[in-house]
Curated annotation (Swiss-Prot):
Keywords: Ribonucleoprotein, Ribosomal protein, RNA-binding, rRNA-binding
Chain intervals with Basic and acidic residues compositional bias: 239-255
Region (Disordered) residue spans: 232-265
GO molecular function per UniProt: rRNA binding; structural constituent of ribosome; transferase activity
PANTHER family, alphabetized: LARGE RIBOSOMAL SUBUNIT PROTEIN UL2M, RIBOSOMAL PROTEIN L2
Gene3D superfamilies per record: 2.30.30.30, Nucleic acid-binding proteins (2.40.50.140), Ribosomal protein L2, domain 3 (4.10.950.10)
The name this protein goes by in its record: Large ribosomal subunit protein uL2
One record GO biological process: cytoplasmic translation
InterPro entries listed in its UniProt record: NA-bd_OB-fold, Rib_uL2_dom2, Ribosomal_uL2, Ribosomal_uL2_bac/org-type, Ribosomal_uL2_C, Ribosomal_uL2_CS, Ribosomal_uL2_dom3, Ribosomal_uL2_RNA-bd_dom
Subunit structure: Part of the 50S ribosomal subunit. Forms a bridge to the 30S subunit in the 70S ribosome.
Role noted for this protein: One of the primary rRNA binding proteins. Required for association of the 30S and 50S subunits to form the 70S ribosome, for tRNA binding and peptide bond formation. It has been suggested to have peptidyltransferase activity; this is somewhat controversial. Makes several contacts with the 16S rRNA in the 70S ribosome.
Gene (UniProt): rplB
Length: 288
């Protein structure tokens, strides 16, 4: 499980580091849990003008419906397969529930085919029903997760579905409890208060090797729907504020093509209600 480095037979393979896909156990998705998805081409419907740069084409894909709520309380589910999902960096797991229903969830590290997972709702937990074990794949409200546990797939509002920590290799950590809230350290280093009725899944999102992947050639980017990103300094003055000049010239403050300041310029619009729940801000360097 992980990545493989190609032999430098061609220029496209020289620096390529790709997935080995050894963790996958099934090639075709569960058809009842997918639907056709038309890629966003980044152009207007009427005139075909670019509305969002660097997008276009890409392979045909079907969207996988992921269960981000984990609301089937106390119904055990068996891991049937580990599958690829073109819409996210993480792998997904197909669960077969005891009542016959099938659902996809994100693949936690160390969860294998044949394992059993279970979740419990806040309502059932406060009634005194037995809590699931603290092991990868099980889900429960933050109130009942021990301090120090690594978690992912975290809700911000009870019952609204997970919004945080869903990418490959990521995890957050419960570091405290206080008056109806859990203190959670996010991958960015930010410490935030989250309602302890919110659901979270135990464990770390699988495929931590994702950050090592290098596509190696432009063609693989096009397969993923990514078009070339041309530097502003390589354009003409009519096309970009950085354009023009003799040779490779700089000497201007970094700007977008429309004159907006970039690189260090704060783009957040005012304060948000949720800012009051931030105990300490994220690290400037990104992940902890």
């Amino acid at each position: 499980m992980g990545v493989r480095k190609l032999k430098p037979v061609t220029n496209g393979q020289r620096h390529a580091i790709l997935y080995d896909y050894s963790e996958l156990t099934r090639r075709e998705p569960e058809k009842s849990l997918t639907y056709y998805y038309k890629r966003a081409l980044g152009r207007s419907r009427q005139q075909g003008k670019i509305t969002s740069r660097w997008k276009g084409a890409g392979n045909k894909i079907r969207y996988r419906l992921i269960d981000f709520k984990r609301d089937k309380s106390l119904i055990p589910a068996k891991v049937y397969s580990i599958e690829y999902d073109p819409f996210r960096s993480a792998r997904i797991v197909l669960l077969h529930y005891k009542d016959g229903e099938k659902k996809y969830i994100l693949w936690p590290d160390k969860l294998n085919v044949g394992d059993t997972v279970v979740s419990i709702s806040y309502e059932d937990a406060i009634k005194g029903k037995e809590l699931p074990d603290i092991k990868p794949g099980n889900a429960m409200p933050l109130r009942f997760i021990p301090v120090g546990t690594f978690i992912h797939n975290i809700e911000l509002n009870p019952g609204r579905g997970a919004k945080l920590v869903r990418a490959a290799g990521l995890s957050a950590q419960v570091i405290g409890k206080i008056e109806g809230y859990a203190q959670v350290r996010l991958p960015s280093g930010e410490v935030r208060l989250i309602n302890d009725k919110c659901m979270a899944t135990i464990g770390v999102v699988g495929l931590a090797e994702h950050e090592l992947v290098k596509l190696g050639k432009a063609g693989r980017s096009r397969w993923l729907g990514m078009r070339p990103n041309v530097r502003g300094t390589a354009m003409n003055p009519v096309d970009h504020p950085h354009g023009g000049g003799e040779g490779k010239t700089k000497g201007k403050h970094p700007e977008s093509p429309w004159g907006w300041k970039t690189k260090g310029y704060k783009t957040k619009r005012g304060k948000r209600y949720s800012d009051r729940f931030i105990i300490s801000k994220r690290n400037a360097g990104g992940k902890v």
